[in-house]
Amino acid sequence: XDNVQDSPSXQD
């Protein structure tokens, strides 16, 4: 699964 979200939620 790819965790790709268009929101900077503390994810690099």
Swiss-Prot record:
Protein origin, superkingdom: Eukaryota
Miscellaneous note of the record: On the 2D-gel the determined pI of this unknown protein is: 5.0, its MW is: 11.7 kDa.
Protein name: Unknown protein from spot 2D-0014M9 of 2D-PAGE of liver tissue
